[in-house]
Amino acid sequence: MKSKVIKVALTGGIASGKSLVSDLLEIHGCKIIDLDVISREVVMPGTKGLQELVGTFGKSILSSDGSLDRKNLRDVLYKKGRNRALIEQILHPKILHKMKAMMDDCHEGVMIVVIPLLVEKELWGPFDRAILVDCENETQIKRLMERDDIDSAKAKTMLLAQASREQRLRLNEHLPTDVIENNSRVSDLKEKVQALNQKLFAFL
């Protein structure tokens, strides 16, 4: 059945290239909702999200200007296993509430919702399809080391905190899934995204 809007979840492992793919899809006319962006908005100074984080972990997670120091929060997250659960308990309901409100405001076209933890949190319910940005683990580690200026051990720890590549590749058991491999040149990725964009708009 033809629909005025198609809801597509975009996911992938850390440093797989999700942001680049979503940027390219936006250029081609897709509407983008990015949970990484929302996650920053719900911890802006003065928000309940930031107040609850400070109440739980103390002012050491704040920068000198009162904003969230994301590096310090990340250190807290990896220090104790239960800290991750506490952070998620505080932030995830706020993020998902804002995501739903933004999705409800979109009534036509191709809607792309970037959800890094789609597989881990089994959030496929609202969506018609999925896009999985996939790359080799070694590529992720290299990109993480360059992007975050960390060593390989820290990068591997960050990878282990997420679903495995194999788990993500089973996403098609829950949603029709287009896999975009991102192991090579940006020019190759652009061609793949352009073809996928044409496929998605054909569903409308």
Please name every model-derived segment.
Residues 1-37:
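Walker A (P-loop) phosphate-binding motif
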Residues 21-22, 32-44, 59, 136, ...:
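N-terminal polybasic phosphate/anion-binding patch
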Residues 24, 28, 50-54, 137-145, ...:
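An amphipathic alpha-helix signature
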Residues 31, 37, 129, 176-178:
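Well-ordered beta-strand positions
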Residues 37-108:
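ATP-dependent small-molecule kinase phosphotransfer cores
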Residues 93-97, 111-116, 157-163:
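Short gly/ser/thr-rich secondary-structure transition/capping motifs
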Residues 112, 125-148, 158:
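Conserved phosphate-donor/acceptor-positioning beta-strand/loop module used by diverse small-molecule
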Residues 125-126, 146-201:
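Small-molecule kinase domains that catalyze NTP-dependent phosphoryl transfer to phosphate-bearing small molecules
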